[in-house]
């Protein structure tokens, strides 16, 4: 995850080639700790952009955080 200047959008290092599609919801974690959730608003071959939907209290999404597609199993 790479933060942008816009407060509510982050850039992900994965995109269409990694199966990330428009509208997917991702959970963002740092280590074992949940940081928040985002929804994919744009996806290109190797990058995508996500709009932050929710942040855990007093948390921010930082470079190096891991975004995983939220599925029924890991929700």
Residues covered by each model-derived region:
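Surface-exposed, polar/charged interaction patches used for macromolecular assembly or partner binding
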Residues: 1-75
């Amino acid at each position: 995850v790479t933060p942008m200047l816009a407060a509510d959008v982050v850039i992900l290092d994965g995109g269409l080639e990694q199966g990330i599609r428009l509208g997917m919801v991702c959970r963002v974690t740092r280590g074992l700790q949940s940081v928040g959730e985002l929804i994919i608003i744009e996806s290109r071959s190797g990058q995508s952009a996500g709009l932050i939907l929710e942040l855990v209290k007093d948390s921010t999404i930082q470079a190096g955080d891991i975004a995983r597609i939220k599925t029924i199993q890991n929700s």
